[in-house]
Swiss-Prot record:
This is UPF0758 protein PSPPH_0210. It comes from Pseudomonas savastanoi pv. phaseolicola (strain 1448A / Race 6). One of its GO terms (molecular function) is metallopeptidase activity. GO terms for biological process: proteolysis. Pfam families: RadC (PF04002), UPF0758_N (PF20582). The keyword Metal-binding applies. It comes from the Bacteria. Zn(2+) binds at residues 173, 175, 186. InterPro entries: MPN, RadC_JAB, RuvA_2-like, UPF0758, UPF0758_CS, UPF0758_N.
């Protein structure tokens, strides 16, 4: 049955306009993005099918072009649309961060870092560079691959901090396993970087680990 034949109060778009996006299920939100279904399936039916195929919204959003377009109803145009929407969301978060102190809104900072790194399939190490008022200047990925004390070079981190004229920074890396518990190597790396950056008067405010669920703050865990 076409969504157009549904009662207005049950249609996803009308529900969003009346109640807000937060009131909709994942399938309803995805149906609005899809706009149309396929033969024998409404947009909502198709959305439910896709969420089942991808085992949830996260895997669907993180899928590469080949995996995404292998599903009925999803083509390159939809993939491009989705990437554009997600990038606009990331930029909106970054713009909001630049207006406020990172210390005053740590939850927003962690959500931003999660949005930047959660889709990465391999380990990535990055820095969020801040000015002397703890406002975000820029986010930069510095290393890809195995993230440990022997692979991440303090000299390069110091060099990028100096290039941005940063007063402080927040270290960040992801755990593709989804488990955010810091390893001994994570703790040792944080100590090395903190000591190296202290020599050029750049303060390390936190080290955030991104995985499944909420990002982990090493400061809040008492590990820095």
């Amino acid at each position: 049955m076409s969504i157009r034949s549904w009662p207005a109060a049950e249609r996803p778009r009308e529900r969003l306009l009346e109640l807000g996006a937060g009131s909709l299920s994942d399938a309803e939100l995805l149906a609005i993005f899809l706009r149309t279904g396929v033969a024998g399936k409404s947009a909502v039916d198709l959305a439910r099918h896709l969420l089942n195929q991808f085992d949830g919204l996260r895997s669907l959003l993180d899928a590469d072009l080949s995996t995404f377009t292998s599903q009925l109803g999803l083509g390159p145009a939809k993939f491009a649309q989705l990437q554009a929407v997600m990038e606009m969301a990331r930029r909106h978060m970054a713009e909001s961060l630049r207006r406020d102190s990172a210390l005053e809104n740590p939850t927003q900072v962690r959500n931003y870092l999660k949005a930047q790194l959660r889709h990465e399939q391999h380990e990535v190490f990055a820095c969020l560079f801040l000015d002397n008022k703890h406002r975000v200047m820029t986010f930069e990925i510095l290393f890809r691959g195995t993230i440990n004390a022997s692979y991440v070079h303090p000299r390069q981190v110091v060099k990028r901090a100096m290039a941005h004229n940063a007063a402080s920074l927040i270290l960040c890396h992801n755990h593709p396993s989804g488990i955010t518990t810091p390893s001994r190597s994570d703790i040792d790396l944080t100590k090395r970087l903190k000591e190296a950056l202290m020599l050029v008067d750049v303060h390390v405010l936190d080290h955030v680990i991104v995985g499944d669920g909420e990002p982990l703050s090493m400061v809040e865990r008492g590990l820095m």
